[in-house]
Amino acid sequence: MHKYDVVVVGGGHAGCEAAAAAARLGANTLLITHKISTIGEMSCNPAIGGVAKGVVVREVDALDGIMGRAIDQASIHSVILNSSRGAAVWGPRAQADRKLYKQAIQEIILNYNNLTVKEESVDDFLIESNNNGELCIKAVITSSGEHILTSKVVLTTGTFLRGVIHIGEQVTPSGRMGDKPAVELANTLKKYNFKLGRLRTGTPPRLDRGTINWSILQEQVGDNPPVPFSYLTEKINQPQVSCFITHTNENTHKIIRENLHRSASSYLDDIIAPRYCPSIEVKVNKFAEKSSHQIFLEPEGLDDDTVYPNGISNSLPIEVQREMIKSIKGLENAEILRPGYAVEYDYIDPRELFHTLETKKIKGLYFAGQINGTTGYEEAAGQGIIAGINAALSASEKKESFVLHRTDSYIGVMIDDLVIKGVIEPYRLFTSRAEYRLAIRSDNADRRLTQKGYDISLVSHERYSVLQNKLESIKQLEEKLGSLTITPEQLRSYGIKISYDGIRKTALDLLSYPNIDWNKLQEIWPELSSVTRWNGKMGHTKADNRAKNEICEAVEIEAKYKPYLIRQEADMKFLREEINTQIPINFNYSQVKGLSSEVIEKLQTIKPATIGIAKQIQGITPAAIVSILVYLRNRKTKVAASFA
């Protein structure tokens, strides 16, 4: 029998990040997937990133993950969403050439050190009890009956657990168009008493590029130059193409309304679909007052005639889909290459997980991605990398785990939401979910997380060197700006009015004002024109222009956010101290006086690792938190006294 430190099941976005992370940490890792040819498949939209989501991609990259580098090799239309607003809500997004993205992922995964890929499916586990009576993973059992020994398993099954596809009245067991579902594995999870629920999602029909009348559509041009996701990418090399915009109309809506009874939405209403990415049937039915809905026509590749009409996901019968498409401006003669469909699938209640994404029921078993009730490639990747890291650390018998918090990352926000609050609908990240979004931005993911990754040997020396060079250059530039001073009176000659208190202001001080930018500073201090060639004494391995832009941008953003970040840091410090108060894993809450039976039951079920986590559980009162804190402190005092 073969033996591996870590086995990852599923070759999607979560699985690839989990497998790569475990392998980077030195774990002998096996990635098991139904088809090697579908590793890195973009099952739905051909794009990576977006508001909040783009920050996650940067965070994964900062930890030496692979998604950012792969999309940079496949990017054919790049934009920074919300670029006219503050940096806290910037959303990097890139349209991908599907083939190039999958090719990039496969090239990385199939040549990764410490990583083996096997084409197979997993149906069951070999589980044993340890000396403490805990259930532990000992092996995975494949559909062919093979036992593969391992103590750590990461499940990243996507929409495959008892997946069923719906196109009108046509129902097909499938995890994705053309791929069989994972039925036995779902039964296995049920056997071990995991709480399973049912969710659904959907995808639009794919259109033939050559049958679309592009001349009457609104063109949407990407950013020039396109901005890479990865901190290691010098520039985007692929040719950039435009996307186009059209809209549904009253006739489109009439066709949909007349056929709502034939849509899967009509008989799957008890299975919840994504709230923030609704099907066109839901849009028309829920927002009846709207006369049109926007559709983005997104190319799926440079040499691919397939077009993705973002905004009309549906599960109507194919003949209705054809009629609907032809009612839309520019699509009157459009041909459908593949129909849209809905897919329903099993997910587990993520409250059954620790923040490491290890399950509470079975030691050594981790879940990541849509199996946890999330939606989106980026959310999957963020979970995958955390699960892979912790599986590898645990396999190496290192005591520490790797947990990101709400205060340091969007990944931390997402996982905290999942394991504490759970989900009743497909979970999607937004900036509004992050209380500390001013500090966890798309521009500073490397400065927030790369050191953390390097400290556990997850991050390469190359990436760490790039970060150190960047930090040194930022420091030098801030020192340069801090050495240049001017009085409020002198500023009047440049049309700048600030408080006339007689106190000299540095160039760095001025940069914090909303109406002062680099151009204004260069007007006051012409010698700062050299900042356009700023490269720092240590230099950079990336293209000078991007390095310069990142450094100047970092200094300006930090200057403008500084007053707010100082206040926020005080809040974050208090929160960190509170959330880091540890609660023993097998803590007996019934010993704490004053806790109701309801509170005890919730705490025993969720098993919060810290006071901060316990506070977020619905129904846990401040009085209960105080009682637990007092009990823990008294116990700590008694233990200390016994050793005195």
Swiss-Prot record:
Homodimer. Heterotetramer of two MnmE and two MnmG subunits. It comes from Wolbachia pipientis wMel. Its main location: cytoplasm. Belongs to the MnmG family. Its cofactor is FAD. It is found in: Cytoplasm. InterPro entries: FAD/NAD-bd_sf, GIDA_C_N, MnmG, MnmG-rel, MnmG-rel_CS, MnmG_C, MnmG_C_subdom, MnmG_C_subdom_sf. One of its GO terms (biological process) is tRNA methylation. GO terms for cellular component: cytosol. SUPFAM superfamilies: FAD/NAD(P)-binding domain (SSF51905). HAMAP family: MnmG_GidA. Keywords: Cytoplasm, FAD, Flavoprotein, NAD, tRNA processing. GO terms for molecular function: flavin adenine dinucleotide binding. This is tRNA uridine 5-carboxymethylaminomethyl modification enzyme MnmG.
